[in-house]
Amino acid sequence: SLLAVSMIFTMMSTTVVHAQSVKDGSNEVTVTPNVGVSYVSPEETIETRGTSRPSKVWNIKSKGQYDFAGSSHYQNLYTNYKFTGKTSYKVYVENTGDNPITVTAKRLTKTYGSTKISAGKTGSFEFSNIKSDTEFYIVFEGNGYSFSGHVK
């Protein structure tokens, strides 16, 4: 019956195990739940309806500081929002992992600020070369990394 088939699929789906291994001999990644970040760049996201890019924007002037945290084995992570509202910003990141990460504030064609943060250290950068209505996002790059922080 349909119920039996769906139960079999449900039981089978719970036995699937996804394993990722790091082959360069580095320490295992500290798994931090992704909060406010994902593997999808705001510049690459396409709406399923309509022809314009999504307008998912966080106005820091009106909504305040945006917090984020995440971890990845090797893929870049991006903030879920583009940011706007001010003419100067500060990005603060704590590297909670065992490998260095590079944090960059940018839009598709321009980089506003960037820093490389060693394992277990904190880092920040500020930039003011931006108009209050210009949108930017933050990208996190590295191998086997985890972090938490905010932009304000």
Feature annotation, model-predicted:
Residues S1-A69:
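N-terminal prepro-regions of secreted/extracellular proteins
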Residues G64, T87, K121, S132-E135:
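A glycine-anchored, Pro-Gly-centered beta-turn/N-cap motif
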Residues Q65-T84, S146:
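Short beta-strands within extracellular/lumenal beta-sheet-rich domains
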Residues Y78-K90, F127-S132:
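Extracellular and analogous surface-interaction loops
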Residues S88-K90, D98-T102, E135, S146-S148:
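Exposed beta-strand and adjacent loop surfaces of beta-rich binding modules
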Residues V93-G97, F140-G142:
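Asparagine-centered strand-capping/turn motif at beta-strand->loop junctions
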Residues G97-T115, V151-K152:
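Short, surface-exposed beta-strand/strand-loop-strand elements in extracellular ectodomains
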Residues K116-I117, E126-K152:
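Short, exposed beta-strand-loop hairpins at the edges of beta-sheets
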